C-alpha cells in the first residue's frame, strides 16, 4: 500500500473541467525521441515489441516462455509504473487492397493479372483485416528530461535483452510513432490523414494535441462518443483462482478496434514481505479468534474454511517470494472497445464479459461516470486515472500472457498464403530479409511445385524489372513459361540449342579481373571432365590458356565473337608441356566429340524475361558438366542484369542433383553467397531433403537461408529439419501429414504456419497444377 499511495500522490493532479477536446489528452510536453511529459515530473516512453509463437508451443516450451516472461516483468525494477498495451487496429481496406493488387500493363497477360487480383481480394475478404501491436509504456518520476532520458536508455537496454531471450524484438517509439497511435485511435477511419512533421511543429510552437485530437467527444455514464464512434472502457474487477494463459488472446481476438492495457507497479521486496507478513498475521489472528469462540461454545471440531484457504494462499505467496523469485505487483487491467452503434457496443461488451468469465472465471465491469479516466488509463500515455487495483505475483501477472503467434506482412511483399493460426495474409518481401535466398521443401503431392509456380507468376506479372530463370530437370514448367511468352531452352547432346561454356561479359566480376574468376570456373569444369582434382601444374596451364584465349576478346572491348571450348583446347595443344596435351585429350569428347553441345557459340535467346533450362534429356555423362555451365551462364545473366539495374530470380528445381557432384555443389554455393549483392535471389527446390542434407554445403545453405518453406515432409526429413533449423516438436506438426499447400515457413527469425489454396476455376490454376486431368 505504501508504494501505491506514493505513486498516487506523484500522479495526482488538480482536476480541471476540460473546455476542449485537446484538454482531455494528458500530454504536457513531447520530445523528439518519444519521451512524453504526462504530469508534474512524470515522464513516459513507449517500446514496441514483436510477438512470439506461444500458441503453437508445447507445454514444456510454454513453461519456458512463461519463465522468460517472468524475467521481462521483473526487469523493470522499483519506482516505475509499467503499462502493457495490446492495440487492435483495423487497416484501411481500400488502401490495403491498393497495396497488394497487381497493376495492369494492358498486354496479353492482363487476363492472368485479373485472376490473381481476384484471388487476392477473396483472401482479403476472409482475412481478419486487423493489425495487432504490443507496447510497454514505462512511466517514471524524474526531476528533468535529461534524467528521464538517461533512465529510459537503461530501461531500453534491459528490456531489449530480456525480450530477445524470449524471442521478441524491442523498438523504442519516437514522438511521431507514439502520436500516430493516438491519432489513429481518436480519428479511426482517417488513418491515412496522419502526416505530422514533428520538427516543423516544434519550430512553430504548435500544440501536438491539435493534430491527434478528435473533432468531438461526448461522455455518458457508461460509454462515450468519439468522432461519432461509440466507445466503452471496462476493467477487470475480479478473477478466480485459475487464470487461463490465453485470456488476453481471447479478449483481443475480436475483429474490431480495441485496446487492452495492464498497468503494474512493482512493490519493493522489503515492503512486499512486510505487507504479506502483516496480512498473514491478521488472518492468523482472525483464525485464533474464531477457534477461541468455537471452544467457548464447546464446538472443538469447527473449521473456518475461508480463513484456512486464505492462510494457505498467503503462505504460498510468501514462499514464492522467498524461494521462486516472485515479486508483488499492484495491477490494473482495463480495456476500451469501439463500435459503430450503441447496440453493437452492448453486444461486444456482453461478448467480452462472457469470454472472460468462460475462460478464466474473470469478471469485467463497466466504469460508471469514469469513462474518460478509463480511456486515459487504457491508452498508452503512461498515466493511471482509475483505482481498480488487484495485487498479483509475477506468476499470476504473467498468466495474462500477451504473446500468441508471429505475423509477417512486409510492405511491398508477395503473397504466400494465410497464417494458419490468425488467418491473416502473409506477405514476404525478400528485400526486407538479410538474405533473400530461399528454399522450398516438400514431398511429391505436397504442393511444392504449385507454390513455386505461384511465386514465379507473382514476380513475373507484378514486376516488369525482374527476370526469371528456371533450371527444370523434370520438364515441370514448360506450359507456364510458354503461356507467359517465355523461352524454353532444351539442353541435351542432341539438341540444336547450344550454350557456350566460355561466355563471359564485361561485368562477370565486380572486383578485379573477370578472366581470373572465369579461369576458376574453367578449372572446375576441367576437374569435372577429368573426374579428379587438378594439380598445381594443371591449374597453372589452365589459367595461362584462359588468359590467352580471352586476350583478343577483351582487347576488342568484349565486342568480338567469344572464344569457345574448342579455342581453349587448341590453346592447350599449343603449349609445350605434356600435361597440357593430356588435358586437351581429356576434354576432346566435349569439344570435338559427341558431347560437344557446350563447345559451340550460344545460339539461344537468353534476353527473354522468363527462361527455363529444360535439362531432362541431359544424360548422366553430360549432367554434371551441363549443370556447371548452366550455373555459369546464370552468373553472366545476373551480372549483366545488375549493370542494367534489373533484378534476377533463379529457381533451381530438384536442387539435390547439384549436391551429388562436388564441383556443381561448390559452384552453386559460390553463386548462392554472391547473388544478393548483384540484386538477385536464388530459390532452391527439392523433394529429396534427406539426400540433399547429406552434403555439408547444402546444410549450410539451408540453415543460412532467411526464407524456408516447408510443406509436407517424410518423418525422417521432419527430424532432420527440426534439428537443422531449431524447430520444436510442436511446430513440426505443421509440416507433418498435412494436405497439399499447408506447411511452415521460416521467414527471418519468424516461424509461421500457413495454408495456401488457389481457386481451381482459373487459367492460372491449370497452368500451375501438376495433377493429371487438371493441368494444361
Predicted regions and their residues:
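Post-Walker A helix-loop "phosphate-sensing" segment adjacent to the P-loop in P-loop NTPases
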Residues: 458-469
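A short helix-turn-beta junction within AAA+ P-loop NTPase domains corresponding to the substrate/partner-engaging
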Residues: 485-489, 697-710
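Conserved lysine of the Walker
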Residues: 448
